[in-house]
């Protein structure tokens, strides 16, 4: 019982270090609700098709997160994008890339069959399926930095093992987005891992909370 109390107190301390979304807006990217709403309106037809024909809504990234990511990319003008856990995020990144010259996208998955399914979905919408790697292929690649990294790989029990790797793949001026932090054990592990790092952590709940109570965190270097 004492260990549970200590863990709970430690968890509260860790959560107290998470900065509010208003700080993210003011200090990094002024992504306003209007920007996110416009992005959601743009993405919604594609999203509804995706959760009807490709993946269940509770397994796919939320429309809220998709809209935020798209709006953030547009606001910051990112040129290098990485998503771990291919799917609708791979579509969002490539849709943005198709509208902006010189954007490079890399999508990674630990399920080769699902990666092929994502490729098919991209081709269906006239988007390139280049830059799609299995997790093993990605881990064997030379270290590369990305402006925007979305870590949504597999289930959180697997995902936690690669937080350090994706943090290393995030550019100094870039952002790492960690989804599904509504799960207390995962959130605790993430915050405990990051407490020794020179990072700032921001609560994206106000702009990414969905009907399943899922939401995300943003992590900035320095």
Task: Show where each model-derived region lies.
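C-terminal substrate-binding/active-site "lid" region of AdoMet-derived donor-dependent transferases
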Residues: 155-222
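Membrane-proximal basic amphipathic "stem/tether" segments
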Residues: 1-52
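SAM cofactor-binding core of SAM-dependent methyltransferases
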Residues: 58-131, 135-136
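Conserved acidic residues
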Residues: 79, 147, 174
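Distinct, well-ordered alpha-helical segments
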Residues: 93, 142, 159-163
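Active-site flanking residues adjacent to catalytic metal/cofactor-binding acidic residues
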Residues: 82, 108, 151, 178-180
């Amino acid at each position: 019982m004492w260990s549970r109390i200590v863990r709970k107190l430690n968890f509260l301390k860790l959560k107290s270090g998470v900065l509010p979304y208003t700080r993210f807006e003011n200090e990094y990217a002024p992504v306003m609700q209007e920007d996110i709403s416009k992005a959601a309106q743009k993405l919604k037809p594609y999203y509804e098709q995706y959760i009807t024909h490709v993946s269940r809504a509770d397994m796919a990234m939320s429309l809220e997160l998709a809209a935020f990511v798209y709006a953030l990319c547009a606001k910051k003008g990112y040129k290098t994008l990485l998503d771990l856990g291919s799917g609708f995020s791979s579509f969002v990144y490539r849709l943005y890339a198709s509208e902006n010259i010189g954007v490079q996208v890399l999508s990674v998955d630990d399920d080769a069959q699902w990666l092929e399914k994502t490729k098919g979905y991209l081709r269906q919408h006239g988007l390139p399926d280049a830059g799609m790697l299995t997790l093993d292929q990605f881990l064997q690649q030379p270290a590369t930095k990305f402006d925007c990294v979305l870590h949504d790989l597999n289930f959180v029990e697997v995902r936690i093992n690669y937080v350090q790797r994706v943090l290393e793949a995030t550019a100094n001026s870039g952002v790492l987005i960690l989804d599904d932090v509504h799960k207390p054990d995962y959130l605790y592990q993430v915050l405990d891992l990051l407490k020794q790092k020179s990072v700032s952590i921001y609560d994206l709940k106000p702009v990414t909370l969905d009907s399943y109570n899922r939401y995300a965190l943003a992590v900035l270097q320095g």
